[in-house]
């Protein structure tokens, strides 16, 4: 939403009453009665599901799902481990209002831990997504010489450096 310019985390606001109704389903905030009036930075800080649903709606399903794809969700990372799963992402043609809402705050998808780490790493390193590796290199135990090594493998850009900087600030603010 930041990359697309549909929200300013510090200027745009949201009122959290404690829940939002989406397609007849009530999506609640973890805080009974809600958080009240907050900036979208505060929405992230407080992990407010209704506020993130609003962000998902501002972005729209096509753009949200294009970013899921861009960050590698729904496909294998190519990590050097056997049995990697691609996770589970709704097909775009089956995404309605409720699927958009739950996907926006992370409960409408199933991702692997390595996909999550790879995506968060891209967010905080300037937007560059790299192929993950378990081992950087193998060394011969007696001489300590490199037997095999893996170079950093750039995959693609995901977000701008400016958005990355804003997200680093937001993620630090969450902590």
What annotation goes with each model-predicted range?
Residues 2-175:
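Beta-lactam-recognizing serine transpeptidase/beta-lactamase-like catalytic domain environment
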């Amino acid at each position: 939403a930041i990359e697309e310019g549909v929200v300013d985390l510090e200027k745009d606001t949201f009122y959290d009453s404690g829940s939002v109704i989406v397609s007849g389903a009530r999506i609640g905030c973890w805080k009974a009665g809600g958080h009240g009036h907050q900036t979208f930075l505060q929405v992230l800080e407080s992990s407010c599901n209704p506020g993130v649903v609003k962000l998902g709606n501002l972005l729209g399903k096509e753009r949200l799902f294009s970013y899921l794809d861009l960050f590698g969700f729904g496909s294998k990372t190519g990590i050097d481990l056997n049995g990697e799963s691609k996770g589970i992402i709704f097909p775009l043609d089956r995404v309605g209002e409720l699927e958009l809402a739950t996907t926006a705050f992370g409960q409408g998808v199933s991702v692997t831990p390595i996909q999550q780490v790879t995506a968060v790493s891209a967010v905080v390193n300037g937007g560059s997504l790299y192929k993950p590796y378990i081992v950087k290199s193998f060394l011969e135990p007696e001489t300590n010489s490199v037997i095999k090594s893996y170079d950093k493998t750039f995959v693609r850009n995901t977000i701008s450096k400016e958005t990355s900087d804003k997200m680093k600030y937001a993620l630090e603010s969450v902590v």
